[in-house]
Amino acid sequence: MPRGDGRLNHDLLPGEKGPQDACGVFGVWAPGEEVAKLTYFGLYALQHRGQESAGIAVSNGSQILVFKDMGLVSQVFDETSLGSLQGHIAVGHARYSTTGASVWENAQPTFRATAHGSIALGHNGNLVNTAELAEMVADLPRQDGRATQVAATNDTDLVTALLAGQTDEDGKPLTIEESATKVLPKVKGAFSLVFMDEGTLYTARDPQGIRPLVLGRLERGWVVASETAALDICGASFVREVEPGELIAIDENGLRTSRFAEAKPKGCVFEYVYLARPDTDIAGRNVYLSRVEMGRRLAKEAPVEADLVIATPESGTPAAVGYAEASGIPFGVGLVKNAYVGRTFIQPSQTIRQLGIRLKLNPLKEVIRGKRMVVVDDSIVRGNTQRALVKMLREAGAAEVHIRISSPPVKWPCFFGIDFATRAELIANGMTVDEIATSMGADSLSYISLDAMIEATTIQKPNLCRACFDGEYPMALPDPQLLGKQLLETELAGGTDAADALRRP
């Protein structure tokens, strides 16, 4: 079936998407600047964090305009659409769905009218008390006898509705800033939020700081973004990270900050492994250097006699460089990646499906033939890609294929913004390392240890969420039935008060 952006919903390797992050967020307050174009370039730098939909909201001081659609940033926006978004405040979002289906209604920024004007909001992360938030929306004061309606089926629209609908004890509507101090302490999970009303840009980060969020300075304004790389691309200088549990407001009076919860840092270690751009810094540590160091430590923990080290491009390259450096085995390019293939633009026949990984990667036979190969990758989720890769390298003449992974086995699902499979689908959950190697057809398989990976980040272990590797989640989780990606679609089909809140007017 065609998607909203004209592409087709057909993966080349069914069931093997790899780790997918929730989203990328960007916000700017800069009078006199072309804030829509700055946001466009910021989202372009964050495209790796979400490819399903993109949107930008802009305020000129009196009204907020929102433009969003399905597709990549470059597919959604052009000169005409960007030119129509005039103002001095902007919020942008690039989405990959972790709660709610991939449909236009769930594209962000979300938008909602308030008693004082309106609000637009973008969210990176995933919430774990979505069912509770839906009940809270159902309990909001009724307007003209009608309950608050939520058109989307994602956790972000629930937060937007809560921020827009708060009142004090006398029933007087609260401002967005007042509402944020009341609502955010009740929101559980991972959230890096960028939101706005007509005159103010806001940003907030969950008390654990699970997803990254940074503050930057322009000559005539301020920028907030998921990653420092997005600051670089729009010419902003890095100021600091938004602290866990912090709310920042930026308007004509300057920047003000407040704390809505105590900071209990638990940054996602998988940002260092795979999710973030290599040219991003997180908590003062460069991601590329962390990945190279993971490769070095992997080589010391899992040496092997071989002729050549290659990477699964592009995410495995830094670790492969480190592995080659520490092992003394030459690093080379053995696989050529087609940068333009993600999902197919045609209906795949069975023949096309059998091509699978070859449409994404092609081996350099002259480099591979007769060689004992070390193939370095960042992670294994289900194993389909690595299995196809080993087969391809064998056919290209590799004498031996040794797989080395710069993260530990992924054994637990993520509920905080990475679309990992259910635990039953994770290959490392039901098989030993040797069994996985055999299933892939590899001569050997080794993973880096958890401690070595964490040491490579230079971040203290207690300050990192590593739940996908060790099952130690940074907060209490509700019943698994209340954590599904399609939770709100399921809720909508029911007959509860929360379902009434979710139905469209």
Q: What is the predicted function of each stretch?
A:
Residues A152-T153, D157-L162, F331-G342, A437-T457:
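A conserved beta-strand->alpha-helix junction
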Residues L184, G199-T200, G235-E241, K391-P505:
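PRPP-dependent phosphoribosyltransferase catalytic core
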Residues G328-M373, N384, K411-A421:
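Short, glycine/charge-rich flexible loops or terminal/linker lids adjacent to PRPP-binding catalytic cores
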Residues V35, T98-T99, N129, Y202, ...:
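Flexible loop/turn segments at secondary-structure boundaries
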Residues K182, A230, S237-F238, G245-E246, ...:
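Phosphate/diphosphate-binding loops
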Residues Q143-D144, E169, P303-D307, E325-G332, ...:
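Secondary-structure transition/capping motifs at alpha-helix termini
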